[in-house]
UniProtKB/Swiss-Prot annotation:
CDD domains: IGPS (cd00331). Keywords: Amino-acid biosynthesis, Aromatic amino acid biosynthesis, Decarboxylase, Lyase, Tryptophan biosynthesis. It comes from the Bacteria. The gene is trpC. The keyword Lipid metabolism does not apply. Its EC number is 4.1.1.48. This is Indole-3-glycerol phosphate synthase. One of its GO terms (molecular function) is indole-3-glycerol-phosphate synthase activity.
Length: 271
């Protein structure tokens, strides 16, 4: 299973990074940054304080546009790769937020890509990686991320609950990714405020937009619902809007487009 390989590789990467920069050091720096920004363990949770949540809860279908160089299912997606240029195209095209892959082995991502993008855009940035430890959440804060991805299928309920608490204390939103009914219910029980439904099965990599349409009814209206993967036409986005979806994560369709601004506008044409 490719997901299991990614998880094992990520564990090794975290251990190497911890040897270079111990967790107590990175935790202290991230916590101090959050306190300066008005967050911390005693701060109250208000959606408008969290940049990513405020943006993705706006009326209509909000576009979370992804920057990724490669993927296990498609191989190399973008040989000529300039993440800052792509991010600016996304922002000018009407993206609400940007997702940046930082996983280096299977997606050829880099932490530097996120830092560079964050400096150049005025919209929220999501760190998309395979988060297995709190260490990576502290990293995300220091990289400048506004949001992190938490994948239900690779975390225990105890981990997910704990990571959501850390995110709140750091002023980070958490997009909690699910794929089926059981995972959606687990995410909600753990306190997730943003539910993502991946239309791609991470075990088989098969894609079906019906997954988002089917699971939308399980998520309360006060939570943010984001449909992820396999979205490539204005008709699909119109259908998702009618189902009450708040946002869509679009990656490969945009990464392969020669004119990304035009592609975003085309995808929005039926809204």
């Amino acid at each position: 299973m490719i997901l299991e390989k990614i998880v094992e590789t990520t564990k090794d990467r975290i251990n190497q990074e911890k040897r270079r920069l111990p967790e107590e050091v990175i935790k202290k720096s991230a916590t101090e940054m959050a306190i300066k920004q008005g967050f911390g363990s005693s701060s109250s949770i208000s959606r408008d304080k969290f940049f990513f949540e405020e943006v993705m809860s706006r009326p209509g279908v909000n576009f979370l546009c992804e920057i990724k160089r490669a993927s296990p299912s498609k191989g190399m997606i973008a040989k000529d790769f300039d993440p800052v240029f792509i991010a600016k195209e996304y922002e000018e095209g009407g993206a609400a937020a940007i997702s940046v892959l930082t996983e280096p082995t299977f997606f050829l991502g880099k932490d530097d890509y996120l830092m560079e993008v964050k400096k150049e855009v005025g919209i929220p940035v999501l760190r998309k990686d395979f988060i297995l430890e709190a260490y990576q959440i502290y990293q995300a804060k220091l990289l400048g991320a506004d949001c992190v991805l938490l994948i239900v299928s690779i975390l225990t309920e105890e981990q997910l609950t704990g990571f959501l608490k850390i995110c709140d204390e750091l002023g980070l939103s958490a997009l909690v990714e699910t794929h089926n009914q059981e995972e959606v219910m687990r995410a909600l029980q753990c306190g997730a405020r943003i539910i993502g439904v991946n239309n791609r099965n991470l075990s088989t990599f098969e894609v079906s937009i019906e997954n988002s349409l089917k699971l939308r009814t399980l998520v309360p209206k006060e939570a943010i619902f984001i449909a992820e993967s396999g979205i490539s036409t204005p008709e699909q986005i119109k259908e998702l809007k009618e189902a009450g979806v708040n946002g869509v994560l679009i990656g490969e369709t945009l990464m392969k487009a020669s004119n990304k601004k035009l592609m975003i506008r085309n995808l929005k044409s039926l809204l």
